């Protein structure tokens, strides 16, 4: 029996939360996210119904006038590998095209072979490899020898850049190894990506979120307990100095953790490993619409 695909309603959230609370070892975020997704004008949430019961859910959101993001696909444990996900995906693509999207992207964790295989079956192509990395601030922080164990700021720090410097930041990244590996993408709210624009850098500078210094450039976002770095531009020889400066910046802001989202360029991943970051590989998929 083919499932009925329809737009989700607020009343569906309770049913969905009942079979998604233990999707992963740590649980699942989907039940908490659905109310916000349902309320957004730039997003759609679709469900698959069989005999009146919701057995699948998936969502898409417009991140720019031409870029859509697929997210939150979940299938009831009793109905997996029965084509429910294959039925939801085309309906999401129809919605995205109607909004003006020319591409749909998604993110899959490296370990999730089932989701990666499903992406390929749906006509997506793997376009980039990224990593999500984090470490506690204070643990293994830069401590020069002979100072009695006290942290001191690194010699090469980062300062807030002026919005007039945004063009220079973009130029330092454009056409380089990091831009190519990233496929020109910028993480939005950590777990979504769209093309980086000059306005992203200039607007960040206006709120002191664009940093610069001899090691390079970085975007930062303040979270309650962490400093997030969704974008940086540096050379291989400066990767260590850049990460050290970001650790210091997070410590100075009183954060407990530094988190970065970067393309999986080998020398940058190696620099993260040398500084005790916990690294989680990610795959980015894209499909023309």
Protein language model annotation of sequence segments:
Residues 11, 20-59, 177-210:
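Active-site rim helix/loop that mediates acceptor-substrate recognition in acyltransferases
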